[in-house]
Amino acid sequence: MPTNEEFYREYERLKDAGNLADAVAELEKALAQDPNYALAHSALAVAYGRLGKHDDAIKHGLKVCELEPNEPFSFTAMSVTFQRAGKILEAEDAMARARTLQAQR
C-alpha cells in the first residue's frame, strides 16, 4: 500500500496536470488509510473549495483545526475556506482564533 507521502505526491502531480478530480481521489485514498493525515485534509479543503464543493471544503478544514488546534495557520486557512463559502461570520471567528494563537507564540 502506498504511503501518505506517495499519495500526496500523486495528488500534486495530478493537480499540476490540471486533473483536480483525480487528484482529490488520491487524497481520499490517503485518508482511508490514515484518517488523521492533516496535510491531506488541508489540501482537500483547498481542492474542494476550487471545485465549488464548499461543504466538503469546510468539513476538511475543520478537521485540520481539530487535528492542529494550536496552529494559527490552520485557522487562517479555515477563515479563507469559510469566506469562499460565503460564511463571513464563521470566517471572522476563525481569523480571530488564528490571531489569538499567533499572539500566544
Question: How would you name each of these model-derived features?
Answer:
Residues 2-33:
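Alpha-helical segment of the N-proximal tetratricopeptide repeat
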Residues 16-28, 51-63, 85-97:
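Structural signature of tandem alpha-helical TPR/SEL1-like repeats
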